[in-house]
């Protein structure tokens, strides 16, 4: 009986270790979403070195083999862009803002044929250097593709909830 309990305990520890060290693809994709949100967020006391590191992290999360598609209402840069172009636009946009706070409110991941689709809702609070403040909650869809064993963002678009 004692040997059975020890065997069950060893199996339980092995399962927990497996789950911790080998997360599911969905968890890895959600982690990429967390990383891109963190690379865009900007606290008021952020220094130049932190900003540069975040810009590099942002660019590393994007597909650098193809253009990234952006289709977001009221976004001035809709269309297809290279990863370096988007990283440059992200850096410029962050310069105009005192703070950027993006919070993930919920996300659902679907993976099919090496393409991941994340339906998520994000809450934004942005304060510009000119004193304007924007608070908004919007649903989005992000698409990622597995490239060289890493999930890279290939598209961002608004999720149409209601059509006019």
Feature locations, PLM:
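Short beta-strand edge/turn micro-motifs at domain boundaries
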Residues: 113-119, 132-164
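A mature extracytoplasmic/lumenal domain signature
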Residues: 72-74, 108, 120-124, 157-160
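Surface-exposed, charged secondary-structure patches
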Residues: 85-130
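Ser/Thr/Pro/Gly-rich low-complexity linker/stalk segments immediately outside membranes or between
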Residues: 21-37
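Short, well-ordered alpha-helical segments enriched in acidic and aromatic residues
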Residues: 32, 45-74
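Hydrophobic membrane-insertion alpha-helices, especially the h-region
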Residues: 5-19
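Short, hydrophobic alpha-helical membrane anchors of single-pass surface/secreted proteins
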Residues: 2-7, 25
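Sec/Tat-exported extracytoplasmic proteins
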Residues: 37-44, 62-66, 90-97
């Amino acid at each position: 009986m004692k040997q059975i309990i020890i065997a069950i305990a060893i199996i339980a520890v092995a399962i927990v270790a497996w789950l911790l060290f080998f997360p599911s693809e969905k968890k890895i994709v959600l982690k990429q979403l967390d990383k891109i949100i963190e690379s865009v967020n900007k606290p008021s006391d952020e220094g130049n070195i932190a900003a540069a590191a975040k810009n590099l992290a942002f660019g590393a999360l994007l597909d650098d083999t193809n253009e990234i598609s952006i289709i977001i209402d009221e976004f001035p840069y809709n269309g297809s862009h290279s990863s370096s172009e988007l990283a440059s636009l992200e850096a410029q946009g962050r310069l105009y803002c005192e703070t950027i706070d993006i919070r993930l409110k919920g996300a659902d991941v679907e993976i099919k044929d090496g393409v991941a689709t994340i339906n998520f809702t994000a809450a934004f609070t942005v304060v510009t250097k000119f004193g304007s403040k924007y608070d908004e909650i919007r649903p989005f869809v992000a698409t990622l593709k597995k490239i060289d064993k890493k999930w890279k963002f290939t598209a961002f678009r608004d999720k149409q909830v209601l059509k006019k």
